[in-house]
Regions:
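Helix-loop segments that flank and shape redox-cofactor active sites
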Residues: 56-79, 147-164
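Extended, helix-rich structural scaffolds rather than catalytic motifs
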Residues: 194-231
Length: 231
């Protein structure tokens, strides 16, 4: 008996996409939200505050490099100093893209209390005050910067604000690395109860100023945990 074979399999018509049934612009595992929590003006104001803070920190660290007697601290401050200069440039480049707002007008402290806080951070100039210098930067200022940058990152639009998100992530990488360096330097310098008390007194004084300022971007820097309307 001879088997019979078809020369070609019978073709079936492929179903076509139904234009009357549109698909979502984003996949089910990536359903982004367009608006974000910041208006263009609010984002620009925050970025201007970031730039001002980074510039002031660059100046403070640069001034200390020449006077701190501890060589290991001197080298680390020099490295960190130029990171903050780069961050200031990074934020400056974001400002002109925001509705042609004037970058110089936006480059300012959030309020007078933030300006007073930064003056206090930079105030210790005597060579024997290295502990006070390190506490101000690595136990107060940088943790507050990390909080502000993280809040901004978590609350802005991944669609319309992707360049700012990229800048925030790069800055945060540096901030975490520098915070770790600074904290380890500080721990290595505290050898007595008196050193611990110096560090504690310095941190308390600066944290009090920051509370009065409301954060590096003023009140609302990291949102309001007591605002029940945002639940």
């Amino acid at each position: 008996m001879t088997a019979q074979f078809n020369a070609c399999p019978e073709k079936t018509e492929e179903p076509m996409a139904d234009p009357r049934k549109p698909r979502n612009a984003f996949t089910p595992w990536d359903r982004r939200e367009l608006p974000g929590s910041f208006t263009v003006e609010e984002s620009a104001r925050r970025i201007g505050n970031y730039k001002w803070i980074e510039m002031r920190l660059f100046e403070a660290l640069g001034g200390w490099v020449a006077t701190v007697p501890e060589l290991d601290v001197k080298l680390r401050l020099g490295t960190h100093c130029y990171k903050h200069a780069w961050h200031a440039e990074l934020w400056h480049k974001r400002l002109p893209e925001l509705r042609e707002m004037n970058p110089e007008r936006l480059t300012q402290p959030a309020n007078d209390r933030v300006a007073a806080f930064m003056e206090a951070v930079a105030e210790p100039t005597d060579p024997e005050l290295t502990i006070e210098k390190l506490v101000g930067v690595y136990r107060v200022l940088i943790p507050h910067k990390i909080s502000a940058y993280t809040y901004h990152l978590n609350n802005t639009s991944t669609i319309t604000d992707a360049p700012t998100i990229r800048s925030l992530k790069m800055a945060l990488d540096d901030e975490f690395e520098d915070w770790r360096d600074g904290e380890m330097l500080l721990q290595s310098m505290m050898l007595s109860k008196a050193d611990v008390e110096r560090a504690s007194a310095r941190q308390t004084a600066l944290e009090s100023l920051m509370v009065e300022a409301g954060g590096i971007c003023g009140p609302g820097t990291i949102g309001d945990a007591y605002d029940l309307s945002t639940r």
